[in-house]
């Protein structure tokens, strides 16, 4: 085991981008079963999920959760085992369109090629707040932070108008929509083609 400061590396928590030839090197067979059909997980046109941008939180019951993903594949979460910091293999999730997935867990937001990444959860006054970055990280990409809230850590998350954080279809430039409470945005000042300022 490799020690990183006061942390100890134990192993990967979730995988993405694997193929049929290397899936045995992941924990997918352990989660789904040795003979599970993994076709949807090896197709970028199906799930398109990236295992990036983790955020770990503990709920009021003492359960530990991790959110992650994904820009175009949606933001997801599943329960962790607090003794190992890895996935809680005793927790299972049904595969239901736009709600949950047997491997990736509970869907929190985004999906269908719409931007949405960097999920972060904050608990305050009885609500869980989901913060997510929309847009593209470039001068004209409209990179910004949107916020949704829920009474339950697993959602559903919605904005003040009742719009859900979960995308059920491709929207296009969803960062130009009015879904989610916009907190911060990128701007482009005329006469300055090289800067990006977040306000």
Predicted regions and their residues:
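Carbohydrate-active catalytic/glycan-binding domains of CAZyme proteins
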Residues: 1, 5-197
